[in-house]
Amino acid sequence: MSLSVTRENFDEWMVPVYVPAPFIPVRGEGSRLWEQQGKEYIDFAGGIAVNALGHAHPALREALNEQANRFWHTGNGYTNEPALRLAKKLIDATFAERVFFCNSGAEANEAALKLARKYAHDRVGNHKSGIVAFKNAFHGRTLFTVSAGGQPTYSQDFAPLPPDIRHAAYNDLNSASALIDDNTCAVIVEPVQGEGGVIPATKAFLQGLRELCDRHQALLIFDEVQTGVGRTGELYAYMHYGVTPDILTTAKALGGGFPIGAMLTTQDYASVMTPGTHGTTYGGNPLATAVAGKVLDIINTPEMQNGVRQRHDAFIERLNTINVRFGMFSEIRGLGLLLGCVLQTEFAGKAKLIAQEAAKAGVMVLIAGGDVVRFAPALNVSDEEIATGLDRFALACERLQTGGASCG
C-alpha cells in the first residue's frame, strides 16, 4: 500500500532549496494537470519549458515503454541504438557533426565550457582560458555554470568561484567587445535570456559576437537549453538569427519531460575530447534517447513549427487584450512559445504573487525574476487550452488589480 503524502511532508523531509506550490500534481494529459483533490489546472509553465508535447503524450509513452521492455542501462562502456539514432537526427537537423549526451542543461553547459578550455589550451596554450558570459544569464547550478551565469544571488555563497569568467551586459556589443580578447577561449550566451527576463537577443548582437569570436579565436557557445527543440518557432533559436555557434547546448524539451541533455559541436572541436577527458554514467541511456528521438520526430516538422508561430500570435493577441483591460504590463516579449510579460512600475516585484493568483484561478505560469511573468506552454497546446488558460490568467490579474489577491 502506498504511503499517503501531503505538501506539508515536503517541508518535513526535503532539503529546503525549493518552495513548491501548495498543491501536489498527480496526473496530467496534454496541457492539463490535476492535483490530489481533483482540481484542474491549465499548464502554461510546461515544467519550465520542458514538457514540449504536454503531459503523457501517447507517442512518448509508447517509445518509453517499448524501450523499457528491452533494457534500461549499460553505462558508457557500451553504446546503444537509440542514442546513435538520436545523435544522427541531431546532426542531420543542425550544424553539428558530433554529439555528447548527458542528463541536464547544466551538464551540457559544463561539457561545453570544458571543451572550450581544453581546445584553447591544446591549440594555443594555457593562458587562453578566459570565458565571457553575460549579466543575468542562467547556465545551470554546477559551480562552473553558476559562475558563468552572472547572477550573484545564485553564486555568492559558494566562493571561491572558478576564475577567469567575466560578464558583459546582454545585448550590448560594446560591453562584450571590451572583455573579449586573445586570452578568451569562449563566449557563452543565451539567444533568449530566460531566467533573466525573457529577453531576445538582437540579430546585430549575436552577429557581433560571432565576429568577435572569429577575430580572437574564441569559441561561441549558444546555450539553447530553454530555447531549443522548437520552442521559438525554429528547431533551434540560432536559426532565427543566421548565426551559427561553434557549440550548442540543449536539454529541457529534448526529452519532453524525461531527463536528457546534449552538447552539439563540430568534428574539429570535438577532437580534443579524447577518451577519459569527460564522461557521465547515465548520459545517452537508452530510455532517455528513445524518448528524445520520438520528441524530435514530432517537433522537427514544418507543421509543428508553423503551429508554434500561430500559437505565439494567439498568445500575444490575448495577452494584449488582457493588458488593455488591466494595464499591468509595460511590454510583452519573447520568441515563439517562450513569452514574458514585464510588469508596470506600480506592480514591480509582484510576478510571484501573480503566479500564485493564477494557480488559484486554475492556470500555471512561471516567473523570470520579480518583474516578469513567463509563459512556456506545450508546443502543441490547443486553441481551447490557450483561451481557457488565459481567461483564468485574466481573472488572476483582475484580482491583483482590485486588491483581492493574497500571498497565501
Swiss-Prot record:
Q: Does the keyword Transferase apply?
A: yes
- Reaction catalysed? N(2)-succinyl-L-ornithine + 2-oxoglutarate = N-succinyl-L-glutamate 5-semialdehyde + L-glutamate
Q: In which pathway does it act?
A: Amino-acid degradation; L-arginine degradation via AST pathway; L-glutamate and succinate from L-arginine: step 3/5
- At the top level, the lineage of the source is Bacteria
Q: Biological process GO terms, please?
A: alpha-amino acid biosynthetic process; arginine catabolic process to glutamate; arginine catabolic process to succinate; ornithine catabolic process
Task: Name the enzyme's class.
Answer: transferase
Pfam families in alphabetical order: Aminotran_3
Record-listed E.C. numbers? 2.6.1.81
Q: Which UniProt keywords apply?
A: Aminotransferase, Arginine metabolism, Pyridoxal phosphate, Transferase
Q: Which cofactor does it need?
A: pyridoxal 5'-phosphate
Gene Ontology terms for molecular function: identical protein binding; pyridoxal phosphate binding; succinylornithine transaminase activity
According to the UniProt entry, which residues carry N6-(pyridoxal phosphate)lysine?
K252
Q: What does this protein do?
A: Catalyzes the transamination of N(2)-succinylornithine and alpha-ketoglutarate into N(2)-succinylglutamate semialdehyde and glutamate. Can also act as an acetylornithine aminotransferase.
Tell me the protein family, please: Belongs to the class-III pyridoxal-phosphate-dependent aminotransferase family. AstC subfamily.
Q: What protein am I looking at?
A: Succinylornithine transaminase
Per the UniProt entry, what species is this protein from, by scientific name? Answer: Salmonella choleraesuis (strain SC-B67)
Encoding gene, per UniProt annotation: astC
